[in-house]
Amino acid sequence: LDIYITSPDLTSVVVNGSGDFKGQGKIDSDNLSLTVLGSGDISLYDVICDNLYAKMNGSGDVEIKQLRCSAAKYELVGSGDISVRQDRVRATDISLKGSGDFKGYLQDCGKVKCNLVGSGDIRLSGTAVSLEKSKIGSGTINAAQLRVNR
């Protein structure tokens, strides 16, 4: 079953269960909140916003192919995955608890903060002004492909 929705301003997407949400056009919003609870997926093509908050709790996936915003906060709990390509985001906060994976390509971004607890992996590439990271558990924070311009 496919449902098509048109909205002048998208502020929140919640996928609860096994459903999927796919944004096919440009999304321009002040504040955008993305939440997956369960095994569902959110896939967005082009997002422009002031603040992005993405929360994954379960085994689903969140993918953002192009993101431009002032601040982005990602919270991943469980075995799900988040993949994002960011452009000129001033502040990025990544929190991963569990066995999930975060993959981020950061183009000309500002401060990046990573907190990993568990066996998951955070992989970062691109360029950023600063990187702060903390890790507890067997997971890895791989920033070998991230050029940090302090």
Which sequence ranges carry the predicted segments?
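Periodic glycine anchor positions in long extracellular repeat architectures
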Residues: 17-19, 38-40, 58-60, 78-80, ...
